[in-house]
């Protein structure tokens, strides 16, 4: 991958991210984990992501989607990550504002959607209609505020790899011993 490639393309994060300063301590904040992560990303990551932090951290969902659509449709997005239902709302908003028929008309280099939080199957056909590329890649993650548990690590397989070395304790109990 060349340096020019990294500068020219963007990753789009679609998430509900809200953060609030602590009224008792101006140096501490509380809010969604994704918002805290966004606010603490290294500066160089901001070069490769869209939308800008001020939009990503907006509280009001309708205004946020509108501003995200306007800001991101001018970028050359190659990958998207987010919850499928929220991402569909944004993609449809972008199509409505742009007058285009599908997302590949706006982002011809889009090739990857990393999704999680919900079952993707009910949304898959909608994504295929919005992004009619036979080479579009869809990968699932399984994470929560408590940690990152699994990732789909193989193309063409819905199986996920359990992340055993991420500082999470797992205890596996045989089904026969559950009621003991």
Report each predicted region and the residues it spans:
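Active-site phosphate/ATP/adenylate-binding loop shared across adenylate-forming ligases
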Residues: 1-180
